[in-house]
Amino acid sequence: MAIRLYRAYSPGTRSRSSVYYTDITQQKPEKSLVFGKKACSGRNNRGIITLKGRGGAHKRKHRIIDFKRKSIATTARVATIEYDPNRNARIALLHYENGLKRYILAPRSLKVGMEVCSGPEAPIEIGNSLPLAAIPLGSTVHNIELTLGKGGQIARSAGTYAQIIAKEGDFVTLKLPSNEVRLVYKECYATLGQVGNIDAINTCLGKAGRSRWLGKRPKVRGVVKNPIDHPHGGGEGRSPIGRAKPVTPWGQPALGIKTRKKTKASGRYILRGRTK
């Protein structure tokens, strides 16, 4: 899919670029698979900000996405490819033979009218969901389970995928989008192929207003805050941070220093750390 460039009719379109929406075949979502939800704007149940820089997004309806793909031995037909305002990937509406309707992440090259299925005996085709043990070496997969039965958690963003590089015992070795090499239990499910809308990462919003439409608020540097709000704050005029190394608002090392706990239980499954 190509990138759409805009002429400089205004300062907001001078650097703007977006993807084409020609792959979308349906404008309105399936009513039985959407629900309304009030935006929390980064607040918890007590109204306290727990995630900064969120709020003010356009009102949107949430689509119920099937990340588990547990309709085994039932074939589904791709009815539509739709836009989802809650993610940068496209979603596909499946019509199963038994009458069920489900949304899934639309893989690259998935077209309306194609058939997909899930289960250990499913064929090796784009969009099918199988256990990692049943997928050949070198295959690209997405929507990968970390815990059996919990649903896909890895490689769900637009254009992402993981690659199966080894199988040994009860585990399969995956190379993740972050270049991390990790062991995953062989019975965990994954979907074949790469997530669609691969050019989403190459787009440019062009103006601050488009960030506000997405719910992204301005980010304030710590050095211009007060000492009570950030460790870098305070001082007279344009002062330095006053520390040997930069830290987060909570005093943890920032900018390149690893903060993952070395004794974390899941650390034994990571063969090589991420580089991105």
From Swiss-Prot:
Coiled-coil blocks: none
Cellular component GO terms, alphabetical: chloroplast; mitochondrial large ribosomal subunit
GO molecular function, a single term: transferase activity
Keyword Plastid: yes
Subcellular location per the Swiss-Prot or TrEMBL entry: Plastid, Chloroplast
Annotated stretches, region: Disordered: 223-254
InterPro entries: NA-bd_OB-fold (IPR012340), Rib_uL2_dom2 (IPR014722), Ribosomal_uL2 (IPR002171), Ribosomal_uL2_bac/org-type (IPR005880), Ribosomal_uL2_C (IPR022669), Ribosomal_uL2_CS (IPR022671), Ribosomal_uL2_dom3 (IPR014726), Ribosomal_uL2_RNA-bd_dom (IPR022666)
SMART domains: Ribosomal_L2, Ribosomal_L2_C
Alphabetized UniProt keyword annotations: Chloroplast, Plastid, Ribonucleoprotein, Ribosomal protein
GO terms of biological process kind: mitochondrial translation
Subunit structure: Part of the 50S ribosomal subunit.
Family: Belongs to the universal ribosomal protein uL2 family.
The protein's name in its UniProt record: Large ribosomal subunit protein uL2c
